[in-house]
Design a protein with these regions (language model features):
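Mature catalytic core of soluble alpha/beta enzymes
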Residues: 1-190
């Protein structure tokens, strides 16, 4: 794999280790089983969940320089870190462009990256979505970004389905195989 991907995987595995598996990039099969936001989203059978979880676990992937070794059946899903990885690559490229001194980039609505100072010297102002608002133009507040910064928001309101009055969202708990039950609707990080 490339140096960039190797570095990304190394950081993700460190986060997995530091979080004792609460974040785990090896839940690819689990993500595909639920398919939340996809055409085949469903509440899987308990046996199906147990079956895919046996192939998960950040300890099942090993990096040796730019070579990845995974136990048979293990499957990666980098969705939780994809936009952050993308921002790192964009920043690296922008730093090589002498004619680009400032930029504001929207990376899919839930992530925004600023580069350099805004030409008029003011802050880049980014609205944070109100997860339970009826009108998608409603927001909780505005975050002022200065210089090169990255803001990312995620929550149980982005990709989900409701069945029998229960909200099933895309943020999975690798220890249970079900959507995480933290009581938190959304989180924004700068």
């Amino acid at each position: 794999i490339s140096d960039e991907l190797s570095g990304c995987l190394k950081r993700l595995l460190k986060i997995a280790e530091d979080s004792d598996g609460a974040f785990d990039p090896t839940i690819g099969k689990l993500i595909r089983l639920w398919d939340i936001g996809g055409e085949n989203q469903k509440i899987p059978e308990e046996a199906e969940i147990k079956n895919v979880l046996k192939d998960s676990g950040y300890q099942k992937i090993f990096l040796d320089g730019n070579t990845v070794h995974m136990e048979e059946g293990c499957s990666l899903d980098l969705g939780a870190a994809g936009k952050g990885i993308g921002c790192d690559l964009i920043l690296k490229e922008l730093e090589t462009k002498k004619d680009v001194t400032a930029a504001l980039m929207n990376l899919g609505g839930s992530s925004v990256m600023t580069y350099g100072s805004k030409p008029d010297g003011s802050s880049w102002n980014v609205a944070v979505t109100d997860p339970r608002a009826e009108n998608e133009d409603d927001y909780l507040g505005v975050v002022a970004l200065n210089g090169t910064e990255f803001l990312s928001t995620s929550g149980d309101y982005e990709k989900y389905f409701i069945e029998n009055g229960v909200r099933y969202h895309h943020i999975m708990d690798p220890s249970t195989g079900y959507p995480a039950e933290s009581g938190v609707t959304g989180v924004t990080v700068v």
